Amino acid sequence: WQQPDMSGRQYDFLSESVVALDQELAARGQPLVVRVGEAVAVLAALCARHKVRRIHLHQETWNGWTYARDRQVLAWARDAGIEIIEYQQFGVHRRMTSRRGWAGKWDQMMNRPCLPAPDHLPAVDAVSDAWPATQDIGIANDPCPHRQQGDRAAGLALMHSFFETRGRDYRAAMATPVRAADSCSRLSPYLAFGCISMREAWQESQAQRARGRHGWASPIKSFESRLHWHCHFIQKLEDEPAAEFLPFHPAYHAL
């Protein structure tokens, strides 16, 4: 969180989302367990304490710092004999040698059923650390009075209002600063922080398309194109991580 591409308002959004998640998990029998520290040290302590032999996590494409951290975690797990199982969260594929067939793979993933949340979670013998405030981890205050609030329920409400009313002028209004804030979905942070899944947004869009309402075919098609673009451009970063530091085209490297 001290990287130059992070901010206090992003952390506040995450904090609100985590509080809401903690409440939902507690209602199912097991609150969220938070640990603060370096990833390898925290995971090593948890695995030793609870005799963990397998870790489940999701794939992400972020920046050079997180990539280095992830490699450290994978190397530690390999040396410790701990199995790592990674789950794909977007339509981004690891270690692709060709983009041929990418769109078909995207559609295949997004059309799989969404898994329901469990009704009950078994309790674990673990005490949670306190969720750190911004000043605890060296993040400068970054007030933004009209920013979006982090919370799955808030994201679902935005998605509902987009498909019911706000999104009807989406295609025409998205490029207009005066109208875009109301007519666009505003789902980006909820997708980025996992409050809503890409598959969930895609399948809701497909369901709305099937309603066949007059005047909605074009905006829904445009919205679905943006969902594809989301993963298309992240795939570029996955395939070319050096793009964070170098121009995409090698002809510009010496400039």
Which residues make up each language-model segment?
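Glycine/tryptophan-enriched, flexible segments
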Residues: 80-83, 101-253
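Trp/Phe/Arg-rich N-terminal binding region typifying the photolyase-homology
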Residues: 1-119
